Structure formats: C-alpha cells, structure tokens
C-alpha cells in the first residue's frame, strides 16, 4: 500500500489518497479523506490520517480481516503490530523483547484518533462499528469544584471518549536560552533569514504562519502582524485556519 498526493477535480484543493497493492484507491478511506478535504481540513492533517489508515488497512490485509467486522481484540493486535519494526511485521521473524518499540505511545494514540474519526464517519452511513473505538459514558461533573454556567443543562448528557488509549508521557517543549537565540541571529548571513528567525522569536508564531506572511500583513504604526489563512505558493498554512493579530516589537519592525 502507498499514500499519494492528489488534487480534487472540482476545487483543485490538495488532498491525499491511499492506494492498495492492486493500485486502486482504498474506497472507504478515499471517501473519508475526500470528506475532510471538502470541509477544508488541513492538508497536513489529511496526509497524517492517510498514513494512519494505510497502516490499519495493511494490518487488516495481512490478517485477512474485514474492516467492517473488526473486534476489540483486533485493535489490540494492531497496536502490538505497530510497535514492531516494519521489516518484521509480516510475522516471519521473531522479535526479542529487548528491541525498542518502533511506534511511540503518542503516535499510536494519534492513529487511534484517526481510526475513531474514520469509523464515526462510516457509522453515519450504516456501518455499525464506530462504537468499537468511541464509547459513551454518562455525563458527570468535571474534576474539582468548578462548574460551568450551564452545567445543570448538560450534566446528564453522555460524553464521548475513545475506548482504547495508550498512556503517553507528557513531553515538555524545548526552549532556547537568550544566548542561544542571539547566537542564531548573529549567525544569519542574510537579512531575510535574520528577519524570519526574529519574527519567530518575537511573535511566537508557527513556522508555517511566518512563511505565509506578506507585506500587507504588517501594520507598522500599530506594531502588529496579522496572520491570515490563505493559499500560498510555498504551501505554508495557518494551523486551524484561524486568523489573528499579534503585537510585535518596534525592534522587529525596524528590520
């Protein structure tokens, strides 16, 4: 199986598709990914989901399972299969217990989240396996004593949660010291590179947001930068498709 970039015939929007060993699109995956493209989900998100579903259908194919008839035990087998190095996933080679897991807990949980969305989508079209990954639990009070204003209206509503989720340690973000930041700025030989890194440091915006900036997004007098979702030739994207305005320093604008 393979994942390939495609462009939607009607809108020209970039999307992704999973092809089987017969070089034909995997129909249920194609339908869901096309839906995500229509509702303007990020191309990077769709790409990640495509790879997640490729792994799932490769596992189903290897074990001769129908994607509409899977059991909870099959999901557990999929998680164990993901942790194996790809070269031994066909089961012909035994793996020692000391071998490091190939897929982290966070990556496995992301794949489970993709499967949950995939099965929820198809459950709305008459395929009744979405509850395998998404269970319902009675509504209850959140932790602590705080209650939202309309808590009394929603406390009896069932809440959705994933049936299976691996415990994953929280990763602390890595930060640069002021000395490291200055060293990087001083090492930039071109003003363009120095400006890009200074924008990231001063505003805290994401790299995709910075790479999509245009002159019209800068308000010099107000000392503000507006992040605007748009289609860029360099494929830079604003995460979540949300626009916002960020205050910046006068020193940055002088660059």
Residue ranges and their predicted role:
Residues 29-44, 54-151, 183:
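N-terminal core-binding DNA-recognition domain of tyrosine recombinases/integrases
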Residues 95-96, 163-167, 229-230, 250-255:
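Major-groove DNA-contacting interfaces characterized by cationic-aromatic clusters
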Residues 168-207, 211, 242:
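Basic, Lys/Arg- and aromatic-enriched nucleic-acid-binding interface segment
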Residues 208, 212-254:
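Conserved tyrosine-mediated DNA breakage-rejoining catalytic core shared by Y-recombinases
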Residues 2-39, 61-62:
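N-terminal DNA-binding module of tyrosine recombinases/phage integrases
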Residues 142-182, 222, 235-250:
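DNA breakage-rejoining catalytic core of tyrosine-based enzymes
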């Amino acid at each position: 199986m393979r994942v390939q970039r495609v462009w939607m015939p009607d809108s020209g929007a970039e999307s992704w598709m999973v092809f089987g060993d017969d070089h034909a699109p995997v129909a249920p995956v194609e339908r869901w990914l096309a839906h995500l493209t229509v509702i303007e989900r990020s191309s990077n998100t769709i790409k990640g989901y495509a790879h997640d579903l490729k792994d799932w259908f490769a596992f189903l194919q290897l074990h001769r399972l129908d994607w509409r008839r899977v059991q909870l035990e099959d999901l557990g087998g999929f998680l164990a299969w993901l942790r194996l190095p790809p070269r031994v996933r066909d089961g012909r080679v035994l793996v020692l217990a000391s071998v490091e897991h190939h897929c982290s807990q966070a990556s496995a949980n992301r794949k489970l989240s993709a499967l949950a969305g995939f099965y929820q989508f198809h459950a709305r079209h008459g395929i009744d396996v979405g509850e395998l990954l998404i269970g319902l639990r009675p509504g209850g009070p959140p932790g602590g004593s705080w209650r939202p204003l309309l808590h009394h209206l929603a406390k009896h509503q069932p809440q959705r949660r994933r049936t299976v989720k691996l415990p994953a340690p929280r990763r602390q973000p890595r930060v640069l010291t002021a000395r490291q930041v200055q060293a990087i700025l001083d090492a930039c030989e071109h003003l363009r590179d120095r400006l890009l890194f200074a924008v990231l440091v001063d505003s805290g915006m994401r790299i995709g947001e910075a790479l999509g900036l245009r002159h019209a997004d800068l308000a010099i007098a107000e000392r503000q930068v507006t992040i605007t979702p748009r289609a860029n030739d360099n494929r830079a994207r604003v995460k979540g498709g949300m626009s916002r305005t960020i205050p910046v320093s006068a020193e940055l604008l002088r660059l």
